[in-house]
Regions:
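Junction motif at the cytosolic side of a transmembrane helix
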Residues: 80-86, 153-175
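Short helix-to-coil transition segments within interhelical loops
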Residues: 1-5
């Protein structure tokens, strides 16, 4: 028997974490789509019905696809933190600040007047949140959407590459 390469171990762990995240994203988007369909049948106010009916199925699909590289970013970061941590409790301690680092860029996307222009198009997580907002409003520039998807995927790939590099370091594994 030959030992398994460390890269394969990291990728196996990464895809396990990412699968859970993608499944969660899919359930969330499907739930939103289902409730949109229910509310657009006339159960809500007329303004809400008009708004909900204007969201196409392709928009929901694009929202889901925009979440995939975000899931990959978090899977890589969480895996990196879990490799570094000596125990579950220590890993939880490292992951708590990650929640705040995550929430802040998304909150900026919800502020009035913040649009998917200029610097905001390049701020990770904020750009995805703004793109999702633009998709729902029906005002998304699809060329910009692909640029945001690509830049987010590039960040996710960089984090995964760092995770693989770090997992190969003896000093991290046996500290």
């Amino acid at each position: 028997m030959t030992p398994i390469e460390r890269t394969k171990i990291v990728l196996g762990k990464f895809f396990t974490i990412a699968f859970a995240g993608v499944t969660s994203a899919l359930v969330t988007v499907l739930s939103i789509a289902l409730w949109t369909a229910v509310l657009s049948k006339g159960e809500a106010g007329e303004v809400l019905v008009t708004f909900m009916a204007s969201i196409d199925a392709i928009d929901y699909l694009l929202v889901f696809f925009m979440l995939i590289p975000v899931v990959a970013i978090f899977a890589a970061v969480l895996l990196t933190l879990s490799i570094y941590a000596r125990s579950f409790k220590e890993a939880q301690g490292y992951m708590t600040p990650l929640v705040f680092v995550t929430i802040i860029p998304v909150i900026f996307a919800m502020l009035p007047g913040v649009q998917l222009k200029g610097i905001w198009a390049w701020v990770p997580l904020t750009n995805v949140a703004l793109a999702i907002k633009e998709l729902i409003k029906g005002t998304m520039d699809y060329v910009q959407l692909f640029a945001i998807f690509g830049s987010t995927a590039l960040i996710a790939g960089s984090f995964l590459a760092f995770c693989i590099y770090w997992f190969k370091q003896e000093k991290v594994l046996f500290r």
